[in-house]
Amino acid sequence: LSKISKILFILNNFVSKCHHKKEEKFIFPYLINKGGEEASLANEMINQHRVIENLENQLESNLNIKSLQKINQILTDFVMILDSHILEENSVVFAYAEISIDEFEKEIVLKKIGYFEKENSELCNKDKYLKILNEL
């Protein structure tokens, strides 16, 4: 259970509070403003972020009561949604973003993301999370 707690720590902090926040604050608004399929994709990704956060909360609750069967089911659900989410994000959503956001705006977005990462360096420190994973 201690290893699962460490994975949950990474999911809560890096995935939800850093990675998802950057997408929702800096990338998805452009797609939503574009409308059409781009907006639908961005909204679907945001909905999936909420599902992932819900699974994080469920996992935390079940870790606290040491419900191994439920923890196993939640982890299975995590694998399923993260697998499809990452595939869709990398193969479809970011392709639309690449096309939809002009070069000038991309520079602005990248600067804003860089500033966000500096302001949230504790949450967005990939090396810290890689170290935790390597220790598992």
Q: What spans do the regions from the language model cover?
A:
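Small-residue-biased structural context
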Residues: 1-136
